[in-house]
Curated annotation (Swiss-Prot):
Family: Belongs to the uridine kinase family.
Pathway where this protein functions: Pyrimidine metabolism; CTP biosynthesis via salvage pathway; CTP from cytidine: step 1/3; Pyrimidine metabolism; UMP biosynthesis via salvage pathway; UMP from uridine: step 1/1
A molecular-function term among this protein's GO annotations: cytidine kinase activity
Main enzyme class: transferase
Disulfide bonds: none
Binding positions (ATP): 12-19
Gene expressing this chain: udk
Name listed for the protein in its UniProt record: Uridine kinase
Taxonomy of the source species: Bacteria, Bacillati, Bacillota, Bacilli, Lactobacillales
Catalytic activity line of the entry: uridine + ATP = UMP + ADP + H(+); cytidine + ATP = CMP + ADP + H(+)
Cellular compartment(s): Cytoplasm
Keyword terms, alphabetized: ATP-binding, Cytoplasm, Kinase, Nucleotide-binding, Transferase
Keyword Transcription listed: no
Signal peptide: none
PANTHER family (UniProt xref): URIDINE KINASE
């Protein structure tokens, strides 16, 4: 492994294709030591709250995340030390008791709606990417995901989107576009953008190994 891992930040609105872009980049490096760290894993523990209180949490606000812990763990990985990353239980709306061990890698993709919002996190990144997707596409994807994967009802997803997700996108997420080195329209289907980013990562890796 090289002396310092490459950190790539990937952000954009909920349902905008961040994960697809991240996986597309990952798939271009099958023989490299590369891994993805999701900001969603760092949603704060809410076990002290009732279930009714938990479901009212604004999950699209910076305060919902334990970004301090994420920064601390990324710094540990940068120093070549493994960390135990938390996991989040979306059905119980709180942090799970389970963690997973993340070993040091050459490249880390840090993915989430607010990973460019905190300057301390941005300062750790070598490449910052904003996935720019139409609002209509994002809401359709979010409905499909939350109903199929998180057991949500259609009404609850739409209510949350209109009352929280959409306003938080315009208040906190969209403004971080100005920090991005690369803005990708059309998400993972934009093969040119994915290839350009892949080439840049390959160049950084090559330079680090020489």
């Amino acid at each position: 492994m090289q002396n310092r891992p490459i950190i790539i930040g990937v952000t954009g609105g909920s349902g905008g294709g961040k994960t697809s872009v991240s996986r597309a980049i990952l798939s271009n490096f099958p023989n490299e030591k590369i891994a993805m760290i999701e900001h969603d894993s760092y949603y704060k523990d809410q076990s002290h709250l009732t279930f009714e209180e938990r479901i009212k949490t604004n999950y699209d606000h910076p305060f919902a995340f334990d970004t301090d812990l994420m920064i601390e763990q990324i710094k540990e990985l940068l120093a070549g030390r493994p960390v135990d990353i938390p996991t989040y239980d979306y059905t119980e709306h709180t942090r799970s008791s389970k963690t997973y061990r993340q070993e040091p890698k050459d490249v880390f993709i840090v993915e989430g709606i607010l990973v460019l919002e905190d300057q301390r996190l941005r300062d750790l990144m070598d490449i910052k990417i904003f996935v720019d997707t139409d609002d209509d596409v994002r809401i359709i994807r979010r409905i499909k995901r939350d109903m199929e994967e998180r057991g949500r009802s259609l009404d609850s997803v739409i209510e949350q989107y209109l009352g929280v997700v959409k306003p938080m996108y315009h208040q906190f997420i969209e403004p971080t576009k100005r920090y991005a080195d690369v803005i990708i329209p059309e998400g993972a289907s934009n093969k040119v953008a994915i290839d350009l980013i892949t080439t840049k990562i390959e160049k950084i890796l090559k330079e680090a190994r020489n």
